[in-house]
A protein has these predicted regions:
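Conserved catalytic core of two-metal-ion nucleotidyltransferases
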Residues: 26-89, 96, 100-108, 112, ...
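Structural beta-strand/beta-sheet cores of well-ordered domains, especially the beta-sheet scaffolds
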Residues: 13-17, 37, 44, 132, ...
């Protein structure tokens, strides 16, 4: 699930997984399996998810029908937790077992949001969770608290991922990867071909820059110090943030976020 499901994880992070059952299983039989899966992954170096998005959490191991009930409950909520759970599930990719179960559950989610403009807008509004770190004169706005760095994830990667995800969910797309979603949205006319190309290039540049920073720091960081970049790298970073900002505007207009 999450960045792993989208095929966009760089450094290994914590566990993000779930289990879809073809039929109900007695809790006493399921509990041991949940624990075994969790412990096996932990022994391989994948620490627990702080948000408990793991097989061992009963919330994330259910039948298709039970997940369907959850989707409708999450959509009815106006809080961030419900939107986050929908985003997590929508990005999921099957890695074992019957992939048809995941397809069926995702179709249930798509059916649940079809035509639900208010719920889709509530989901999409997270695109504005963080400001774009670009100033009035197109300068990069750094954070002194972070050592004069900019946060690539908050400033560019997340708004692109979530903005594209919201538009993809509205269209009922099955793709999970962000670049693949952009391509399909361009085919459907949501994006102009040129903007789709620019958006894909901006996203890939931000991801590459983050990976370079993680390799240099030997840690899962999203912070980059513009002062340590070349002039060309800073120019490309500004361009990437501006494209992410343009996507925000597309999402705001499409879902009338000024009303929320």
């Amino acid at each position: 699930m999450g960045s792993e499901g989208r095929g966009e994880q760089t450094f290994r992070t914590d566990q993000d997984n779930g289990l879809i059952l073809s039929e109900p299983v007695p809790p006493e039989d399921l509990d041991q399996f949940r624990s075994d899966v969790f412990q096996a992954l932990e022994s391989c170096g994948f620490p627990p998810c702080p948000g408990e998005v793991m097989v061992r959490n009963p919330l994330w191991s259910k039948t298709v029908a039970e997940f369907g009930d959850d989707f409708r409950r999450w959509l009815a909520l106006s809080d961030e937790a419900g939107a986050m759970n929908i985003a997590i599930f929508y990005d999921a990719e099957a890695v074992a077992g019957d992939p048809g179960l995941l397809r069926a559950a995702k179709q249930d989610l798509i059916d649940a949001v079809r035509g639900e403009e208010v719920q889709l807008a509530r989901f999409a509004r997270a695109v504005d969770a963080f400001p774009t770190p670009i100033g009035f004169f197109n300068n990069l706005v750094t954070s002194k608290a972070d050592g004069d760095a900019v946060d690539l994830k908050k400033g560019g990667i997340f708004p692109i991922v979530h903005g594209v995800r919201a538009l993809a969910l509205e269209k009922g797309l099955s793709e999970t990867n962000t670049a693949a979603r952009i391509a399909r949205l361009a085919e459907l006319g949501t994006f102009e071909p040129e903007f789709a190309r620019e958006l894909t290039e901006a996203f890939r540049y931000l991801m590459t820059l983050r990976l370079d920073a993680q390799i240099a720091e030997k840690a899962a960081t999203s912070l980059v110090r513009p002062g340590e970049l070349t002039t060309m790298e800073r120019d490309l970073l500004r361009d990437a943030f501006q494209i992410a900002k343009r996507l925000r505007e597309v999402v705001r207009r499409r879902f009338n976020l000024a009303m929320f």
